[in-house]
């Protein structure tokens, strides 16, 4: 054995062993890699395949038809018709320049087809040129708060990846997005975009040339992309053109392979066959107005682009009518190719239609009522315009005309009107508003819709439920019945008009009196309740109101339903208010206008604060707003809680405690007198009670509340909630819900006092009543009861509010009618609409009352 072998042992064997170990390790490594490949290929391929499939499979929600709205006789007032829409879809993962260019060209080509066949894009872009400056500006809607506009802009920027920091102006956003979608407005701009690309990348490899388009086309294309971006989260197509003609459908489907992302879908469009009839009652549908509302509706299954009822029955009955809830939606699972075209349908679940809503309205009643109120308003307007230039009116109002502030208070003449017809269980048979509008125009959008929305007459307001006004003399049936029922007035008791009513005000320059001229006052002598109503004598009802007092008068008004909402199934009803201390100022509530029934408390509150602040400043004293507010509230509460005789003493105590006023100040007339006068404005007294008794003071009522009240007068004291929905019917015809009349109060007239009220109301259009000359030629003059109401708005009589209420037939009432015309000059002038309606309905009743002799056996009828 040589020295090497001694030192290293058997070297070849050692090398061989090491090589063997290396080979084994290498084999194990390859085995591990191979196993990984096998796992990837065999075990994970199913998962990756599923993931790939999920990007190609899309579930498209399907909706049926929105439910119909019909009148009481099943005449359709609102329905859905099937239409064709053009839709667009782009997968969110596709964002390369070449993809954008392909879709841009597809949008351009599709828009040409749509517009060539008379269609138009369903929306506009949120960036537009200002008409005043020509500069680019955002347009996120009008008539909403700044906070809402900011929220909309923020959401839009986020969805379109244009932050305010990087792209602060609308023009910055426009240019960036235009280039992103591969559009320019000129060849020069295209060169600039290319040059910028080369400067950034070093060469033009990979550069995708832009399409040269005009500005109008650019905005339309960007509008489509914008709408798609706002809709990306639900991965659904957007509708870019609605209700397109069949020519458009055919051309787009024929060119389907050349129009990536485009498709034709069947949808529904809301149609209102009667157009303007009962527009404010039916309402309309529209987009979900805010993201906040959509988040609420999303839980019910609504999609972002679904429509909802925005007003009227469409709104109040949304849950019944809608086809958009998850319970009624169907679905279609489809497979799309790389260009978002549907290549096959995987499954289909049929949607359900919404339910139908049957109203209590009768189309015939509604048609006659709408024509009647339109004619009446025009007639009043003509009368007012004639009076304005008549020598007598100008002479009678000469002093007032010379001193009136015409600039700040322009003359308001009749331009609106409401007419209501209810049956004896307060079911609405007609609810007519004038002027009205075409519901189809509003749903279609465009110039006609904008004209409706911007009309100064506020066409969409349902004045029957959404407006309040002083009722005037139509309130006198409350006072009269209350006086009789409470025993403060005997049925045969006579009250004579003695001129000025001085029980609460001995100053003849301001004391109230009847409307009749002094020379004719004898006509109002020796009046029972019957003549009091017939003549509408204010003095008579001052006395009745004084005897009743504030509390009982208010209680009877409440018993007739005049202090609460009517329960009608329509959105936007406001509550009537009747004069009382708590109506004038309720010390248990905050002073703010939203908490109180009138604006007077906040006016008094601010006046007291301003006065006391000035008093302090004149003496070098400053009061912070919190202390002034606390002091003003205490002073107002004190005025309600204590008699006037103790006001001054209590005022001084409050001023010293709240503001640390020295005795010299609180004993100063300059401090006390004005404060006293201010708090006196929110203190109820007898003078306010007697004004309430004739429908004045702070009493304001809605036409719908008046209609319920007149119905109760006509039917003998039964007060019902007002109903306008008769029933809910499924698409298959099953009655799901029936809205029966709900009796909320019965005045229990066991003494027959309503017979006296009816007799007095009969005399209004007969005998010597306030409207006799307007009804002298009416065939059924003795078969109705009525009451006029003229409520003063200001010193100009032309601006008076006019009311006319009636019921018929007198002996067996079937309908109660209310006519209200803001600035309608006089109640009697408002009677024309009721007269037109009754001239139509009495013959209809006569027809139905005819007894026909039926043939016997199998004989033929003559």
Residue locations for each model-derived region?
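Short helix-capping/linker segments at secondary-structure and domain boundaries
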Residues: 94, 286-294, 488-489, 715-721, ...
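Membrane-proximal periplasmic segments of bacterial cell-envelope enzymes
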Residues: 1-354, 358, 363-418, 545, ...
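Short, gly/Ser/Thr-rich active-site loops of penicillin-recognizing serine hydrolases
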Residues: 734-740, 835-862
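Short, glycine/acidic-rich hinge or "gate" loops at secondary-structure transitions
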Residues: 384-394, 493-497, 551, 850-854
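Short strand->helix junction
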Residues: 93, 366, 468, 823-824
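Amphipathic oligomerization regions
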Residues: 822-841
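Beta-lactam-recognizing serine transpeptidase/beta-lactamase-like catalytic domain environment
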Residues: 78, 84, 130, 333-350, ...
């Amino acid at each position: 054995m040589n020295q090497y072998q001694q030192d290293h042992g058997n070297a070849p064997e050692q090398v061989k062993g090491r090589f063997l170990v290396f080979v084994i390790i290498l084999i194990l490594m390859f085995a591990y890699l191979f196993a990984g490949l096998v796992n990837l290929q065999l075990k994970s391929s199913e998962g990756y395949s599923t993931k790939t499939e999920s990007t190609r499979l899309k579930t498209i929600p399907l909706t049926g038809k929105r439910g119909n709205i019909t009148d009481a006789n099943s005449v359709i007032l609102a329905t859905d018709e099937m239409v064709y829409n053009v839709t667009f879809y782009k997968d969110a993962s596709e964002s390369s320049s070449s993809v954008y260019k392909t879709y841009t060209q597809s949008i351009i080509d599709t828009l040409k087809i749509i517009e060539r066949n008379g269609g138009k894009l369903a929306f506009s872009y949120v960036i537009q040129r200002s008409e005043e400056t020509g500069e680019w500006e955002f347009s996120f809607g009008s008539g909403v708060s700044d906070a809402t506009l900011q929220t909309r802009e923020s959401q839009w920027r986020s969805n379109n990846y244009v932050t305010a920091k990087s792209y602060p102006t609308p023009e910055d956003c426009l240019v960036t997005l235009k280039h992103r979608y591969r559009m320019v407005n000129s060849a020069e701009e295209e060169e600039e975009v290319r040059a910028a690309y080369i400067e950034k990348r070093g060469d033009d490899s990979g550069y995708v040339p832009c399409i040269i388009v005009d500005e109008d086309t650019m905005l339309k294309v960007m509008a489509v992309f914008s709408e798609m971006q706002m809709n990306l989260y639900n991965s659904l197509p957007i509708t870019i053109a609605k209700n397109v003609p069949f020519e458009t459908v055919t051309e787009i489907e024929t060119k389907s392979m050349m129009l990536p992302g485009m498709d034709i879908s069947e949808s529904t469009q809301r149609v209102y066959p009667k157009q303007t009839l009962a527009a404010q009652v039916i309402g309309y549908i529209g987009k979900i107005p805010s993201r906040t509302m959509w988040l609420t509706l999303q839980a019910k299954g609504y999609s972002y682009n679904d429509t909802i009822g925005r007003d009227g029955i469409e709104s109040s009955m949304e849950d019944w009518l809608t086809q958009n809830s998850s319970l009624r939606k169907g679905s279609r699972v489809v497979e799309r190719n790389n260009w978002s075209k549907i290549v096959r349908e995987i499954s289909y679940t049929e949607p359900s239609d919404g339910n139908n809503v049957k109203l209590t309205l009768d189309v015939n009643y509604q048609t006659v009522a709408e024509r009647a109120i339109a004619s009446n308003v025009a007639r009043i307007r003509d009368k007012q315009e004639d009076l304005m230039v008549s020598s007598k009116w100008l002479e009678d109002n000469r002093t007032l005309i010379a001193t009136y502030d015409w600039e700040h208070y322009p003359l308001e003449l009749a331009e609106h009107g409401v007419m209501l017809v209810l049956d004896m269980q307060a079911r609405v048979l007609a609810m007519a508003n004038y002027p009205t509008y075409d519901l189809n125009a509003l749903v279609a959008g465009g110039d006609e819709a904008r004209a409706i929305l911007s009309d100064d007459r506020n066409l969409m307001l349902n004045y029957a439920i959404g407006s309040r006004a002083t009722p005037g003399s139509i309130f006198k049936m409350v006072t009269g019945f209350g006086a009789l029922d409470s025993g403060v007035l005997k049925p045969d008791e006579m009250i004579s008009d003695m001129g000025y009513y001085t029980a609460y005000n001995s100053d003849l320059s301001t004391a109230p009196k009847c409307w009749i001229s002094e020379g004719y006052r004898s006509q109002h002598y020796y009046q029972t309740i019957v003549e009091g109503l017939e003549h509408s004598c204010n003095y008579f009802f001052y006395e009745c109101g004084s005897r009743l007092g504030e509390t009982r008068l208010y209680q009877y008004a409440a018993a007739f339903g005049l202090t609460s909402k009517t329960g009608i199934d329509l959105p936007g009803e406001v509550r009537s208010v009747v004069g009382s201390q708590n109506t004038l100022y309720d010390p248990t509530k905050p002073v703010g206008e939203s908490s109180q029934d009138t604006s007077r408390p906040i006016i008094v509150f601010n006046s007291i604060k301003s006065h006391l602040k000035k008093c302090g400043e004149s003496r070098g004293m400053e009061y912070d707003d919190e202390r002034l507010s606390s002091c003003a509230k205490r002073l107002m509460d004190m005025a309600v809680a204590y008699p006037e005789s103790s006001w001054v003493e209590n005022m001084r105590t409050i001023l010293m405690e709240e503001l640390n006023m020295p005795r010299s100040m609180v004993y100063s007339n300059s401090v006390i007198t004005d404060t006293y006068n201010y708090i006196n404005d929110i203190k109820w007294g007898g003078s306010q009670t007697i004004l309430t008794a004739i429908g004045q003071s702070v009493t304001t009522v809605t036409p719908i509340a008046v209609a319920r009240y007149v119905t109760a007068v006509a039917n003998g004291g039964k007060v019902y909630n007002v109903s306008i929905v008769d029933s809910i019917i499924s698409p298959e015809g099953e009655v799901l819900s029936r809205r029966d009349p709900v009796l909320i109060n019965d005045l229990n007239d066991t003494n027959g006092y309503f017979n006296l009220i009816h007799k007095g109301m009969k005399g209004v259009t007969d005998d010597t009543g306030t409207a006799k000359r307007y009804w002298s030629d009416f065939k059924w003059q003795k078969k109705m009861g009525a009451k006029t109401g003229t409520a003063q708005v200001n010193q100009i009589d032309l601006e008076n509010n006019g009311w006319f209420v009636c019921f018929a037939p007198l002996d067996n009432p079937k309908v109660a009618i209310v006519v209200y015309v803001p600035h309608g000059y006089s109640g009697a002038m408002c009677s024309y609409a009721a007269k037109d309606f009754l001239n139509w309905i009495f013959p209809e009743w006569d027809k139905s009352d005819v007894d026909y002799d039926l043939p016997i056996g199998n004989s033929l009828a003559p």
